[in-house]
Amino acid sequence: MATILSTIVALFIFLTLSVILIKFLIVPSLVNYQYGLLNSPYFTIGESRVQGVGIFTKRPRQMGERLFVAVDMNENVTPVGSKINHCPSMKTISASGRVATGDTMMPNSYLSPHADKTTGEWWIMAARDLGVGEELTADYTYTPDFIQKPDPSWKCEL
């Protein structure tokens, strides 16, 4: 009886550790590899507070800093650019009724107003100083016409 019980406990521990390893190491590594960020010192892909997965900073960023190319010279959204979640500008009210203001105001990044004159690429820019681990968000409402616009009723949950 003790052998069966110890086998069940060992199996439970093995399965639990396997789930933890898969969820917190293997899946994030695969997702970051897919988007070219596996060993990036700048960004990582992770579970979003807004929706699905998002892109997060790995180091502090300065307001106005170019973060990465979001749209290439052929007007195709880059894989990394596709991971920025939409948050409407102005005041955003969460389900709890909290209004975002000041440093917590989203969006915290934006698409450059024009393509780079030399490369034809569109960059994501920091709208304010960003801390380590912040999810990047942008307002898609005023992006160029070749980028799909968001549902006007969408509200960014904080």
Stretches with model-predicted labels:
Residues 56, 66, 121-123:
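Intrinsic-disorder/low-complexity, polar/charged segments enriched in Ser/Thr/Lys/Arg/Asp/Glu/Gln
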Residues 1, 5, 14, 99-102, ...:
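A detector of low-complexity, intrinsically disordered, Ser/Thr/Gly/Pro/Ala-rich segments
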Residues 50, 54-56, 60, 129-131:
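Residue-level "contact hotspot" at macromolecular interaction interfaces
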Residues 36-48, 72-146:
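Catalytic core of the SET domain in histone-lysine N-methyltransferases
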Residues 2-30:
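Terminal signal-anchor or tail-anchor transmembrane helices
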Residues 2-4, 144-158:
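C-terminal helix/juxtamembrane-tail motif
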